[in-house]
Amino acid sequence: ENTVQIQSSGIQSEAYFTIKESNVGHIFGILRNQLYSNKPLAIIREYCTNAFDAHVDAGIPERPIEVSFPTHFKKSLTIRDFGKGLSENEVFTVFNSYGESTKRGTNDQVGMLGLGSKSAFCYVNDFKIVSHHDGVKSVYLAYIDESNKGKISLLSREATDETGLAIDIVIKSEDLYSFREVASQFLYEFNPQPIVLNDDNVVNNLSKQDQTSYIVRNDKYAVVNDSRKSNTVRMGNVNYDFDISD
């Protein structure tokens, strides 16, 4: 972080920048509606990389995450990991606070800004969080209330032998194609490739032979030269375009 050091002599008065309580809903609205230009991509990218990071944290990076697409009977997109899950305190801390992140102390995971876990709010006003942790399955509803600040409510608890976290987001029928296209493109080079449920189109795209050629590749990052896209640097399953033409 960059800070500015100034001489204190001559200062007559000072005040810290802050956000008034009455303006918090307005600021949250800006973060929800203007942070992401491609909302389907933001949702797929943020929650899939979070799920992968959960596997890294649990010591199972080779295990695929699961991505389940909407059907006639189930209208939601579900992204599921099999990591440690989150306690109630962790759910409330991570999901209800912009800027809160569990990843700032490591270089082994993607993201540290504390924004991605709330990315569903750029598309919907509510989504479910299902945590399997310490023998308990807890279902939470994250939603934007009348204050526009948002809340998280615990809906149910029951015993479970499973671990991990699932994010459940209802997708509008007219947007399903956009989410399929984004998933096909983003998850194409995800490693390990996710288990995709309920959508043969995405499954078929992911099963095509990978045409990727690597300029540099190691266990931390890869520099990719791919006929389908520009040169990219891939870190933690996220590609960042760059130009090496010069």
Predicted regions and their residues:
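Conserved RecA-like P-loop NTPase helicase motor core
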Residues: 100-101
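Glycine-rich G1-box
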Residues: 84-85
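Conserved beta-strand core positions
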Residues: 63-65, 77, 127
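Acidic ATP/Mg2+-coordinating residue in the GHKL
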Residues: 81
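Short beta-strand element(s) in the Bergerat
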Residues: 74-77, 165
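Bergerat-fold GHKL ATPase/HATPase_c domain
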Residues: 1-64, 68-71, 89-96
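GHKL/Bergerat-fold ATPase module
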Residues: 206-246
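GHKL-type ATPase core
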Residues: 106-212
